[in-house]
Swiss-Prot record:
GO terms for molecular function: ADP binding; ATP binding; proton-transporting ATP synthase activity, rotational mechanism. Its EC number is 7.1.2.2. It catalyses: ATP + H2O + 4 H(+)(in) = ADP + phosphate + 5 H(+)(out). This is ATP synthase subunit alpha. PANTHER family: ATP SYNTHASE SUBUNIT ALPHA, MITOCHONDRIAL. Keywords: ATP synthesis, ATP-binding, Cell inner membrane, Cell membrane, CF(1), Hydrogen ion transport, Ion transport, Membrane, Nucleotide-binding, Translocase, Transport.
Amino acid sequence: MQIKTEEISQIIESQIQNYEQRVEMSETGTVLYVGDGIARVYGVRNAMAMELLEFPGGLMGMVLNLEEDNVGVALLGPDTDIKEGDPVKRTGKIFSVPVGDAVMGRVLNPLGQPIDGEGPVDSKEFRPVELKAPGIIARKSVHEPMPTGIKAIDAMTPIGRGQRELVIGDRQTGKTAVCIDAILAQKNTDIHCFYVAIGQKRSTVALVADTLKKHGAMEYTTIISATASEPAPLQFIAAYAGCAMAEYYRDSGKHALIVYDDLSKQATAYRQMSLLLRRPPGREAFPGDVFYLHSRLLERAAKVNDSLGAGSLTALPIIETQAGDVSAYIPTNVISITDGQVYLEPNLFNAGIRPAINVGLSVSRVGGAAQIKAMKQVAGTMRLDLAQYRELAAFAQFGSDLDKATQAKLNRGARLVELLKQPQYQPMPFNEQVASMYAATRGFMDDVPVASIRKFEAEYIEFLRDAKGDILKDLDEKKAIDNDIEGRMKAALEEFKKGFTA
């Protein structure tokens, strides 16, 4: 056997040249205290706010408090296996979530991990959950409509792309249903939807996912779920995680809609964390920065200017009130941050007016500029008619001898209230809304019995679809009522009324 010394020396030389001395440096600390989803860690001197720390067993924690000799960490999972003295490692990463089309149609937890049993999320891009909102120069005023398919909202409190419209009301008044309808209405649009469930029951989230699937809306929707059984830090961070995923579309020149259900529970989770981290309590035991908690989240919803891609992110935050008290701490905070609110009332809900929207207390501060012209033309007088109706209805209880004008207003108002009722999960296209409201506001329904208004509307829309499809098509294309369309609509109504039996 001949030993080739040259060959051996070449191999040794190449090995020496390719040798890399790698030393993995990691800053570690020690758990001083753990309990209630909070850990105090000593030794990680260079930790950053919102940085992820790794605990034994792969559990992650997020740095929230930076103190003189230790850091307060919110644990993003169960703390049962962590004990005092355990080693903790810095990751050097700020909390980020996967973004892009890979998350569409999925049900995720706030860490971006799938919980729908459909395999991993194959995303190449990640985005930090906490990002600065666009500045003043980067924004453009809200001017494009975002129809929700709900007549009462599209007519009187219209929502534009890039707006923040609060949905507020007591428990069981249909707040989630209104927002789910808004998601269903985006079916044939270019809007990507996100539903963030914070502190909800698991059965509720399963029902929402099932409803979206049944109506074919899940393909353009992502659900981020932090249910009531999850630790408070996950409930707190869920809204920001959902917002980061939705912002990806805003910054790519596309459009997104995000529903936060609900921010009252997020504030409660944040209060729990803050008190456990020994931050000083303020009003209603909330920490001093609870306003900033919501403002920095909702300011990220914006209409971006053309030079940045003209994308938009529309937010529908939900707030649950206690016994109709909209002047409590969290409701007033969020009302002052948002661009208007849709107020749902239990009295209306129990009276069978559903969606139970109180059109007197509901406002849209910027949506008017985004409202479709045709809708403006038919719904312009509607708010006034309904306000007069409510005022007169209160007086009419005391006296029976009313003059003709008052009776006419009461009759018209009763029919408008009936017209604004709508079944759940049946959003209405805007051209059909315009057609039915035109009939009501121009007096074509004044002689129809109140009990038959819904029947009149359904049959009239069916008649238009079958026999007068060109009217609906022209409304859809022109987005306004000109003399030609108005003449054809009047003729169609007169023709339909001849054959209609209440």
